[in-house]
Design a protein with these regions (language model features):
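Intrinsically disordered, charged and Pro/Gly-enriched terminal/linker segments
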Residues: 2-149
């Protein structure tokens, strides 16, 4: 249509971006953590598309998604839904690989599920990413993080 793309959105058509936006428009996920995990656990939206035209589009979605994920993480942690917390934290790491709050909740949740070795692995992966990004060591020890939330 005049040199532009046009996609007709019908009931048979599923778009994870639109489903995610719909959840975000509710202002929170309304307890739809499982649906949100299913969408964002695949990684960044349009990650394989390297076109500057989409950069602000992707950035805006991530900016809206991050606080919603943090709220869901906190809510699920209070409900002791630790597996969901870990999955949400992993999803948040796609957006912000050095999100300190997500690390704390992931470590706490894994520890509460008696998965201390997995928690240590998570901490080490985070520390490496932090060093690569910030060019300095992560300032908190594993023990500090276990006590932080």
């Amino acid at each position: 249509d005049k040199g532009l793309f046009r996609i007709e959105y019908t009931d048979e058509f599923y778009c994870d971006y639109l489903a995610c936006v719909k959840l975000l428009m509710i202002n929170n996920t309304g307890g739809n953590a499982t649906e949100l995990i299913g969408i964002v656990s695949r990684g960044k939206f349009l990650r394989s598309i390297d076109m500057p035209e989409f950069d602000s589009f992707k950035g805006n979605l991530e900016q809206k998604l991050e606080p919603v994920l943090l709220i869901e993480i906190e809510n699920c942690f209070k409900k002791e839904a630790y597996k969901i917390v870990v999955a949400l934290c992993e999803s948040l790491f796609y957006i912000d690989p050095i999100n300190d709050e997500a690390l704390c909740y992931a470590i706490q949740s894994l520890t509460k599920m008696n998965m201390v070795n997995e928690a240590k692995v998570q901490y080490l992966k985070f520390s490496v990413e932090y060093m690569n990004t910030m060019n300095t060591e992560y300032p908190y020890s594993f023990t500090d993080i276990q006590k932080k939330v």
